[in-house]
C-alpha cells in the first residue's frame, strides 16, 4: 500500500490544485490502484485454478502466466498430481483455509505482485506461517512448502521460493501463538465447539 501511495504521488499533477486537494487526489488514486491490483491478483488466481482443473485453455497473457507456472513447478517439484483450491481444516486447533495448489508432497501458495526479473526480495517469513498452517492441517506424510511469485505486470515472469524444513517447527510455533492470541481477543474457540459436538454425539 505504501508503494501504491508513492506511485500515486508521482503521477498526480499538483500544478493546478492546492495542497489539501492534491493529498486527497493522491489518496484516491492510491486506493484505486490498490483495488485494481487486488482484483488482478484474484483474476490470476481464478485463471490458474481453472487451468489446473483442466476447465480452461488459457490464451494471450494468461497462457504466458500458466505455462510459466507449470514449467516452474515441473523443474522444482517434478511430476505431481496437483489439486487446486483444496479446503483444509485442523479441527483440533480450530482453523481452516484454502490451499492454492497441493499434492502428496507439496503445499504451494501463489503470490501476485508487480515485479521484474531480478527483483531483490519477494519472500517474507510471514508467508511461511500461512503455509505451515496448511501443511499441519493435512494428513501425513509431511510436505514441503513453497511460494510462487507471479508478476502481474510482466506476464510469464515467475519465481519459486521453497521454505527451509529446518524452520518448520519455529514457523508453526509462531503461527500457533498468533492463533491463540487471535482466539482470545475475539473470544472465539471453534475447537471447543467441535469437542462439544463429539461428546454429544
Language-model features: locations:
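Short linear sequence elements within intrinsically disordered, low-complexity coil regions
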Residues: 27, 57, 71, 139, ...
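General "foldedness" signal
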Residues: 56-62, 121, 159-161, 196
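Metal-dependent nuclease catalytic cores that hydrolyze phosphodiester bonds in DNA/RNA
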Residues: 1-96
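Acidic, carboxylate-rich catalytic segments that either coordinate divalent cations
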Residues: 192-201
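Mg2+/Mn2+-dependent nuclease catalytic core
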Residues: 82-187, 191-192
Amino acid at each position: 500500500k505504501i508503494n501504491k501511495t508513492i506511485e500515486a504521488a508521482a503521477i498526480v499533477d499538483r500544478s493546478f490544485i492546492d495542497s489539501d486537494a492534491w493529498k486527497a487526489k493522491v489518496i484516491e488514486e492510491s486506493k484505486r490502484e490498490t483495488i485494481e491490483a487486488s482484483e488482478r491478483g484474484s483474476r490470476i488466481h481464478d485463471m490458474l485454478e481453472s487451468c489446473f482443473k483442466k476447465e480452461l485453455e488459457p490464451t494471450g497473457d494468461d497462457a504466458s502466466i500458466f505455462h510459466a507456472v507449470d514449467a516452474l513447478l515441473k523443474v522444482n517439484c517434478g511430476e505431481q498430481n496437483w489439486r487446486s483450491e483444496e479446503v483444509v481444516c485442523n479441527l483440533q486447533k480450530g482453523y481452516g483455509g484454502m490451499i492454492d495448489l497441493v499434492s502428496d508432497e507439496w503445499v504451494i501458495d501463489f503470490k501476485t505482485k508487480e515485479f521484474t526479473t531480478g527483483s531483490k526480495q519477494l519472500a517474507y517469513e510471514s508467508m511461511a506461517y500461512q503455509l505451515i498452517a496448511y501443511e499441519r492441517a493435512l494428513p501425513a506424510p509431511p510436505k514441503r512448502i513453497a511460494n510462487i511469485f507471479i508478476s502481474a505486470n510482466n506476464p510469464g515472469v515467475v519465481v519459486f521460493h521453497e521454505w527451509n524444513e529446518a524452520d518448520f517447527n519455529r514457523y508453526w510455533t509462531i503461527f500457533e501463538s498468533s492463533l491463540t492470541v487471535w482466539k482470545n481477543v475475539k473470544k472465539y474457540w471453534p475447537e471447543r465447539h467441535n469437542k462439544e459436538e463429539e461428546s454429544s454425539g
